[in-house]
């Protein structure tokens, strides 16, 4: 299964948009790609580098 990764540098406290994310096969696994639409609009609590996997603890209010 694919996970959500950053398709660009995402600064701290930025609200996520679809253009900032892509689905990719990675290890360890992060937020599942099928939840990408669910996290749109949520803010990251730290800077996320290009191609870095989004983990649940990086996204504010992610359940």
Curated annotation (Swiss-Prot):
UniProt keyword Lipid biosynthesis present = no
Q: Where's it found, cell-wise?
A: Secreted
- Relate the protein's function as given in its record: Contributes to protect fish blood from freezing at subzero sea water temperatures. Lowers the blood freezing point. Binds to nascent ice crystals and prevents further growth.
What is the official name of this protein in its record? Ice-structuring protein AB1
| Free-text tissue specificity from the UniProt record | Detected in blood serum (at protein level).
Q: Which Gene3D superfamilies match?
A: Antifreeze-like/N-acetylneuraminic acid synthase C-terminal domain
**What are the entry keywords?**
Antifreeze protein, Secreted
> What species was this sequence derived from?
Pachycara brachycephalum
Q: What is its main location?
A: secreted
Spell out the residues of the site Important for ice-binding: 8, 13, 17, 43
Family note: Belongs to the type-III AFP family.
- Can you quote a single GO CC term? extracellular region
Q: Which domain of life is it from?
A: Eukaryota
Output the SUPFAM superfamilies linked to this UniProt entry. Answer: AFP III-like domain
**Family matches, as Pfam families:** SAF (PF08666)
Task: Please state every residue range assigned to the domain named AFP-like.
Answer: 3-62
Q: State if Transcription regulation is listed as a keyword.
A: no
